[in-house]
Design a protein with these regions (language model features):
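Electrostatic cytochrome c docking/interface patches
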Residues: 5-30, 99
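Short hydrophobic/aromatic-rich motifs at helix boundaries and adjacent loops
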Residues: 6-7, 33-37, 60-61
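Sequence/structural segment immediately N-terminal to covalent heme-attachment motifs in c-type
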Residues: 20-41, 65-69
Protein backbone atom coordinates (compact mmCIF):
# COMPACT_ATOMS: atom_id res chain seq x y z
CA UNK A 1 0.00 0.00 0.00
CA UNK A 2 1.26 3.47 -0.82
CA UNK A 3 0.18 6.48 1.18
CA UNK A 4 0.54 9.62 -0.91
CA UNK A 5 1.13 12.86 0.94
CA UNK A 6 -1.43 15.60 0.56
CA UNK A 7 -5.17 15.70 0.99
CA UNK A 8 -6.37 12.33 2.17
CA UNK A 9 -9.65 12.82 0.27
CA UNK A 10 -7.70 12.81 -3.03
CA UNK A 11 -5.47 9.89 -2.07
CA UNK A 12 -5.83 6.94 -4.49
CA UNK A 13 -6.02 4.47 -1.58
CA UNK A 14 -8.80 6.48 0.08
CA UNK A 15 -10.69 6.80 -3.21
CA UNK A 16 -10.40 3.05 -3.85
CA UNK A 17 -11.52 2.24 -0.30
CA UNK A 18 -14.51 4.56 -0.38
CA UNK A 19 -15.67 3.11 -3.72
CA UNK A 20 -16.14 -0.31 -2.11
CA UNK A 21 -19.04 -1.64 -0.08
CA UNK A 22 -17.75 -2.54 3.35
CA UNK A 23 -18.74 -5.74 5.13
CA UNK A 24 -19.21 -4.72 8.78
CA UNK A 25 -19.16 -8.34 9.94
CA UNK A 26 -15.75 -8.99 8.38
CA UNK A 27 -14.65 -5.57 9.64
CA UNK A 28 -15.62 -6.67 13.14
CA UNK A 29 -13.38 -9.71 12.81
CA UNK A 30 -10.49 -7.51 11.66
CA UNK A 31 -11.20 -5.15 14.56
CA UNK A 32 -11.22 -7.92 17.17
CA UNK A 33 -7.93 -9.32 15.87
CA UNK A 34 -6.05 -6.05 15.32
CA UNK A 35 -7.67 -3.22 17.28
CA UNK A 36 -9.65 -4.46 20.29
CA UNK A 37 -6.54 -5.01 22.42
CA UNK A 38 -6.09 -1.24 22.67
CA UNK A 39 -9.53 0.16 21.82
CA UNK A 40 -11.70 -2.44 23.60
CA UNK A 41 -13.98 -5.04 22.08
CA UNK A 42 -16.84 -2.52 21.96
CA UNK A 43 -14.62 0.43 21.01
CA UNK A 44 -14.91 1.83 24.53
CA UNK A 45 -11.21 2.67 24.76
CA UNK A 46 -8.50 1.07 26.86
CA UNK A 47 -4.90 2.03 26.07
CA UNK A 48 -6.17 3.62 22.86
CA UNK A 49 -8.98 6.18 22.80
CA UNK A 50 -12.66 5.37 22.65
CA UNK A 51 -13.96 4.87 19.13
CA UNK A 52 -17.59 5.31 20.10
CA UNK A 53 -19.10 7.82 17.73
CA UNK A 54 -15.84 8.10 15.77
CA UNK A 55 -17.67 8.47 12.45
CA UNK A 56 -19.45 11.57 13.78
CA UNK A 57 -16.11 13.11 14.84
CA UNK A 58 -13.97 12.23 11.82
CA UNK A 59 -14.64 11.97 8.10
CA UNK A 60 -14.09 8.70 6.27
CA UNK A 61 -10.79 9.97 4.76
CA UNK A 62 -9.61 11.04 8.23
CA UNK A 63 -10.45 7.65 9.74
CA UNK A 64 -8.73 5.83 6.88
CA UNK A 65 -5.64 8.02 7.24
CA UNK A 66 -5.55 7.46 11.00
CA UNK A 67 -5.70 3.69 10.56
CA UNK A 68 -3.13 3.26 7.80
CA UNK A 69 -0.63 6.08 8.37
CA UNK A 70 1.08 5.09 11.62
CA UNK A 71 1.54 8.80 12.34
CA UNK A 72 0.08 8.73 15.86
CA UNK A 73 2.12 6.40 18.05
CA UNK A 74 1.62 4.18 19.87
CA UNK A 75 -0.91 3.16 17.20
CA UNK A 76 0.95 1.16 14.57
CA UNK A 77 0.51 1.48 10.84
CA UNK A 78 -2.17 -0.95 9.68
CA UNK A 79 -1.28 -2.19 6.20
CA UNK A 80 -4.50 -3.52 4.65
CA UNK A 81 -6.00 -3.82 1.20
CA UNK A 82 -8.76 -1.31 0.33
CA UNK A 83 -11.50 -3.96 0.76
CA UNK A 84 -10.33 -4.77 4.29
CA UNK A 85 -10.20 -1.06 5.11
CA UNK A 86 -13.74 -0.63 3.73
CA UNK A 87 -14.85 -3.53 5.93
CA UNK A 88 -13.17 -2.03 9.00
CA UNK A 89 -14.67 1.38 8.24
CA UNK A 90 -18.15 -0.18 8.03
CA UNK A 91 -17.57 -1.77 11.44
CA UNK A 92 -16.29 1.47 12.98
CA UNK A 93 -19.46 3.22 11.82
CA UNK A 94 -21.43 0.79 13.98
CA UNK A 95 -19.86 2.35 17.10
CA UNK A 96 -22.42 5.00 17.93
CA UNK A 97 -21.75 7.45 20.73
CA UNK A 98 -24.06 5.52 23.07
CA UNK A 99 -22.90 1.94 22.40
Amino acid sequence: MLWVMGSSARNPYVIATRALDGDAEHGGLLFRINCAGCHGIAGQGLVGPSLRGVSSRLSDPQIIHQVVSGETPPMPRFDVEPQEMADLLAHLKSFTADT
